[in-house]
Amino acid sequence: MNLQRFPRYPLTFGPTPIQPLKRLSEHLGGKVELYAKREDCNSGLAFGGNKTRKLEYLIPDALEQRADTLVSIGGVQSNQTRQVAAVAAHLGMKCVLVQEHWVNYDDPVYDRVGNIQLSRMMGADVRLVPDGFDIGIRRSWEEALESVKQAGGRPYPIPAGCSEHPLGGLGFVGFAEEVRAQEAQFGLRFDYIVVCSVTGSTQAGMIVGFAADGRADRVIGIDASATPARTREQITRIARHTAELVDLGRDITDADVVLDTRYAGPEYGLPNEGTLEAIRLCARLEGVLTDPVYEGKSMHGMIDKVRRGEFEPGSKVLYAHLGGVPALSAYSAIFADG
């Protein structure tokens, strides 16, 4: 496998820490050891997160193309767009963000706090669009790209989650290589890796990276899209493309893509009772915060799988904490009493 042939622009602090979740593990019976790899602490750029790791492989291409404007898309409380805005500010580039109405959640301050507030503070041109949730290529985003061209700019396209970008899976191939180095350092080996999946390139990159040591199907995706067929197709397609890019040396099969669909409801962006219980439990036992859109759902999935005995006794499970906490203020009514 050859990830090193791709240029990488450093936007993160370096390897992200792995934290034992001792109190949560004990609370759930102590038969499974839970750990978190803190991608939410990976950068000094506006709280970082998993997209910042991905952007390290997109930015060299943007610079080579002499782009002057990063153009991306997400929901109103998109972590992706906040991270793109931060990187643009860091590099002295312009930024155009299309923010679609992906979540059926009505709150008078939803489009004025959290991620979108931070993007505006960093100088991004934020464009609110009423279109609903979809993980594919969006017309509103293509129109934004064209508008930059018409104004004389040189736009660089960054699709939702970086996922449909040809290089979007590379960052989390690097994640797997980083985990292997940390396993060697700490003298342990993780039996499972739990990760939230929506647009797919995070899990796709992990599948390719862990396929190198036989653990592709030990990457357990927790769907948060509530459109799992689309998400599974996108994960599989991106993983196969990424495997070719890095010369993995074997095909990615359908069996390599594990996506648990039990925890996404009621729909994208809206928590269920299990989501909220997991958010509060992790916060109160570990001081680790998760959000109702993504990480709360993957935390719910991991906790429930432990309770159901779906991880063998003695298993070591690594939870990939991808970020998302800046969106919590947009859901303040839900957590008014904690």
Swiss-Prot record:
GO molecular function: 1-aminocyclopropane-1-carboxylate deaminase activity; D-cysteine desulfhydrase activity; pyridoxal phosphate binding
Example of a GO biological process term: 1-aminocyclopropane-1-carboxylate metabolic process
Positions bearing N6-(pyridoxal phosphate)lysine: 51
Keyword annotations from UniProtKB, A to Z: Hydrolase, Pyridoxal phosphate
Record has S-adenosyl-L-methionine as a keyword: no
Cofactor(s) essential for the protein: pyridoxal 5'-phosphate
EC number(s) per entry: 3.5.99.7
Pfam families: PALP
Active site location: 78
Cross-referenced InterPro entries: ACCD_DCysDesulf (IPR027278), ACP_carboxylate_deaminase (IPR005965), ACP_carboxylate_deaminase_bac (IPR020601), TrpB-like_PALP (IPR001926), TrpB-like_PALP_sf (IPR036052)
Membrane-spanning parts: none
HAMAP family: ACC_deaminase
Family: Belongs to the ACC deaminase/D-cysteine desulfhydrase family.
Complex and partners: Homotrimer.
Annotated protein name in UniProt: 1-aminocyclopropane-1-carboxylate deaminase
Organism (species): Burkholderia multivorans (strain ATCC 17616 / 249)
Lineage start: Bacteria, Pseudomonadati, Pseudomonadota, Betaproteobacteria, Burkholderiales
Name of the gene encoding the protein in the UniProt record: acdS
